[in-house]
Every structure is written in C-alpha cells, then in structure tokens.
A protein has these predicted regions:
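Phosphate/oxyanion-binding active-site loops and adjacent basic polyanion-contact surfaces
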Residues: 1-6
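Inter-helix linker motif
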Residues: 42-67
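Acidic/histidine-rich catalytic cores and adjacent linkers
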Residues: 7-17, 21-39, 43, 53, ...
Length: 213
C-alpha cells in the first residue's frame, strides 16, 4: 500500500515540481524504487535520503537490547554517548570514508581511549564527571557486542543516505495535525478526506507563519 501511494504521489509531483531530493524512513520497497541503478526512478537524478532520527532510534533499540543481555550491561552506561556520536558522525562526514573514520572511533572512546596513534577524538576536553565515567574494557563481552552493532554491514550499507542529515519530523508533525481534521476512527469519502487534508494544510501554514512573525 505504501509503495502504491508513493508511486502515485511521486509521479504526480514529478510532473509539477523539479525534485532534487526525497527523504523517507527505511522502507525496503521505496528504497528499491529509488535504487540509483535498478530503481523505477533511476534516471530522474533524485537523491534518496533516509531520516536520521529513525536511524538513531533504531540504533538505540539495538544498543538497549544488547545492554540488557547478561554480561553486557556496560553498554547501557555509554548508550547515549554512542547515539550522540552517530548523530555527530552523520553531520560531520561528507562521504562514507569520512563517516567510517569518525564512527569507528566510538569503539575507542567507550574504552577511555581518546588519543590514538593515527589521531584523536574530535570532542573537546572531557569534564571531570565525564572523564570518570565507567568505561568498557577492550575485548570484553560488552565491547564485542558493541563492535558488532557499530560495524554491522547490513546497517551501514546505506550510510550515504544518512549523510545529508535530513529528518521527516516536520512531515510527521503535519500527519498528526491531519488527524485533528480526519481522525482514523471515522470514514470519509475521497473528496471529503481531500478537503479535510487541505484544511489541515492551511491551518499548519497559518500556524507556521504566525510563529515566524
């Protein structure tokens, strides 16, 4: 259903707008449509970016699951640091090579290693509280589990799509606003639903304009 809706909407917009980039969550079928070599829209030159917030949320879930496993609770101590480092890596890097160089550094950071042979952590000097934070011993079960998550090939195969540092949060906020006019508990004919969606769009535009004034 999402694939059909995406195709219908995207085809319509392509005829009305000069689309340079589209941002979605990690939907397999949509990713297939936007594949630069095999996808339906491969010849359109549209950049496909993935929502950074959903990626960070997914990373948080996997870290939490690993941290609740026996012998790996130290992952929970550094969970926030690892997720923040992912945000930083995506914002700082311009390509896959730069991202991996920065991203892999977190495996040393959580061990308390901030000065390395080929470089150092990019953060400012740590305050006393942070410097005294519990670290993960290299080679421990927790560190091995963290390494498997950080270096997971399946998760990193689309890393370039995160480097544009995009988010769909405003769209999701608008979707919630639509529910005020067209709640899911009620049924509407297509013309009525379209009219209610347009009202939601007008309302959102007015609110946004007032906030900017």
């Amino acid at each position: 259903m999402e694939k059909h809706a995406f195709i219908k909407t995207f085809d319509r917009l392509m005829g009305e707008l000069n689309i340079k980039e589209i941002v979605t969550d990690a939907h397999v079928q949509i990713a297939s449509l936007m594949h630069p070599e095999k996808g339906r829209y491969k010849d359109q030159g549209v950049v496909h970016s993935l929502d950074i917030w959903h990626a960070a949320k997914n990373l948080t879930k996997r870290l939490h699951a690993a941290g609740t496993t026996s012998g790996q609770s130290q992952i929970l101590v550094c969970l926030k640091d690892v997720v923040n480092h992912f945000w930083f890596s995506c914002q700082k890097a311009c390509n896959r090579e730069e991202f991996m160089c920065i991203w892999r550094g977190v495996l040393h950071h959580v061990c308390g290693e901030h000065e390395l042979f080929l470089g150092r952590c990019l953060h400012a000097p740590l305050d006393e509280e942070t410097a005294n934070k519990e670290v993960i011993p290299p080679g421990s079960a927790a560190h091995e589990a963290l390494s498997q998550i950080v270096l997971n090939r399946r998760w990193l195969k689309d890393v370039e799509k995160f480097l544009t540092f995009r988010s769909t949060s405003e769209l999701e906020s608008f979707q919630n606003h639509i529910l005020m006019y067209a709640g899911k508990r009620f049924s509407f004919s297509p013309p009525v639903y379209e009219a209610r969606t347009l009202l939601a769009a007008l309302d959102t535009t007015i609110i946004t304009t007032e906030q900017c004034m």
